[in-house]
Amino acid sequence: MASSAEAAETREAFRESVRAFVEREVLPQAEDLDRHGVFPERLFKRLGQLGYFGLRYPEAVGGQGADFTTACVFYDELAAGSLSLAAIAAMQSLMGTHFVFRFGTDEQRERYLRPALRGEKVATFALTEPGAGSDLGAMRTRARRTPNGWRITGEKTWITNAPVADFLTVGARTSDEPGLASIALFLVDASTPGYTVGRPIEKLGTRSSLTSEIHLDCEVPADALLGGEGEGVKNVGGLLSEIRVMTAALALGLSRRALNDSARYASERQAFGKPIGEHQQITAKLAEMATDYHHARVATYDAAERIDRLAQRSDSGENVTAVASMVKLFATEACARIVDEATRIYGSYGFAMEYPVQRYFRDARFLLSGGGTSELLRNLVGGTVLKRGGV
């Protein structure tokens, strides 16, 4: 096992390679992708070819065998180029493929997981319903046994990648028992008769990360059940800490881009005979932005390392869930503050479509709800503090 210093050095070299890719191939396209709201097919395939989708998966299934902290470096750097592309990559490399890896058959891994990691198939994950977002207990999608497997009926909404997905993991009830105990996960091929993509959702930000409703009235084979009946919420819950820290890493990349652009603009823009960055009000804004970013960065990578220690069984995991929630809450709200201040530093141009700062402002709103809303996370963290009698 590499020493901490060696691991850090390897990670920084990886960061530089991702950053170079982003500067060379992502940034030149970011504005057009946002403006036209199209799926970035060429860049998606490039991410697969470069092995980025398989970072967290073992080499035995076509992955790279990297740790979670390294994956967060990837999400962080990619989001600095395009949060839309980073959101697509997060779905592909984490939620969309995780359950096929953990619970799929060898045949399913060959048919779905390996091509997805290579960027040849698009994956997604479908839990949210029109009447059930964070409240999974209100889920209505139903899976009923048939002689050949399962019949799934229902609808989902806010499904990332759905318009272009080749397969998806779907949450559905296997009985009429209310609450969380009857929810299970199923693998659905997008070519299955009775599976249809519904209304596209026109979004404020992350516009090239295509999102839509889906409708299910389809039959899937018996082995489409991923994990046991009634174990869906438990299995999703096991991934939530990674999802939340990953979302915080996305916020870091967007925050850094907005902060660096603002510092550059403040050095170049003149007002009253000197760069606006030399005026105290602008200096104060940059100081607050940098402080927010620094705190978010330290907390995010600390949480990522905790998850890695838990995976190595060198951490009890007692605080990982709460810490992941706190980090997601702080980093995404810090990002929202940073991009808001960035638009103010740009003055009237912060309201103009010709500068990318307006895209940062719009994209940041996605981070506030993905992985759990700020309101939900405050309830979770506050409840944990009360339960423990403090911190």
Annotate each PLM feature.
Residues 1-85, 91, 103-108, 115, ...:
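Alpha-helical interface subdomain recognition
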Residues 65-75, 135-139, 218-221:
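Structural signature of FAD isoalloxazine-binding scaffolds in flavoprotein oxidoreductases
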Residues 66-67, 135-137, 161-166, 179-182, ...:
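Short glycine/proline-enriched turns and hinge-like loops at secondary-structure junctions
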Residues 89, 116, 131-134, 158-161, ...:
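Short Gly/Pro-enriched turn/cap motifs at secondary-structure boundaries
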Residues 119-127:
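A short, Trp-centered hydrophobic/proline-enriched beta-strand micro-motif
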Residues 138, 191-221:
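Flexible, small-/acidic-enriched active-site or ligand-binding loops
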Residues 153-197:
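A short core secondary-structure module
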Residues 212-238:
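A short, charged helix-loop
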